[in-house]
């Protein structure tokens, strides 16, 4: 038992560094936070098969880490996308990564779910002006506090992903990168990406905006947000969401909006007992897979076990991800975590057409309405095109 615990502690240290006192250490942490977050999401949403993941531990939390696998071309492509993100991140150009799920391979601009990962950098040396509204900007955060915040964020992502209703059977992934235009060279593109030319996207159903949380260090801050179909939130435990509940906005939302618009979002609560919730769900579901909650893409796996922190990146082109989720029974859906969701039925044997399908049909009849704009800022009276990147090739 002691040996197993020691091994888990060692693996945890491999995922998140124990000490954050230099900008390089902070960069490693932020890169791995991005990798583990993407891994958690893609595993629990059933986007890739088990063979695409390795195993790591965060304290007592067993996580799945995305890796390149010859039997899963999709995971290999996502790993290459992540390497492109790392290139922009280390240059301090990267402002936001948007990982989007869509269902029609011919229409990647109509999305069903998306995940935003935002980055901030300390411009004049290490600062801590983003700790809390209730703390002084002169406050300091210890490495232990940073690691605790990192693990809490991953646990919150895990709980949210496990409780969301399942995605459709067949889904595709795309990724968009946004930059700090004032410092990013106009001709810069990360490996595997090209200049984006899409002005906006359509959300398939009624969107729900969730602010999952953030992790600050003296040199960076990392924030995670999720947008999902409102119907997938029907089985979410009310204790998971913050008491601050506001109406879901139906009007246009800026994908690269600044934090001034955060009051439009629901917040994943910091107050509920994450560990108790996870243990309770393990007992209720009795799933062997739930004992190994999944996360994806830890840096060591992405770099194919290279121990050096050298950030050399392959220049191979990135293709669009197309992958299938597990087959779902017509009367019930089961997520990767083992949780079962009953489908609504009519006449005992036919699925009821969802309001999402009705809304989508109405959109097609009346013309699509752009819900997300990628190229403008919420603080600009006249929207200005902002630089962003997308994968070079689509399948």
UniProtKB/Swiss-Prot annotation:
One of its GO terms (biological process) is meiotic DNA double-strand break formation. Residues 344-353 have a biased composition (Polar residues). Residues 24-226 form the HORMA domain. Keywords: Chromosome, Differentiation, Meiosis, Nucleus, Oogenesis, Phosphoprotein, Spermatogenesis. The keyword Transcription regulation does not apply. Residues 354-363 have a biased composition (Basic and acidic residues). Residues 329-395 are annotated as: Disordered. The modification Phosphoserine is found at residue 377. One of its GO terms (cellular component) is chromosome. Phosphorylated at Ser-378 in a SPO11-dependent manner. Coiled coil: none annotated. It is found in: Nucleus; Chromosome. Its main location: nucleus. Plays a key role in meiotic progression. Regulates 3 different functions during meiosis: ensures that sufficient numbers of processed DNA double-strand breaks (DSBs) are available for successful homology search by increasing the steady-state numbers of single-stranded DSB ends. Promotes synaptonemal-complex formation independently of its role in homology search. Interacts with HORMAD2. Interacts with IHO1. This is HORMA domain-containing protein 1. It comes from Canis lupus familiaris. The lineage of its organism: Eukaryota, Metazoa, Chordata, Craniata, Vertebrata.
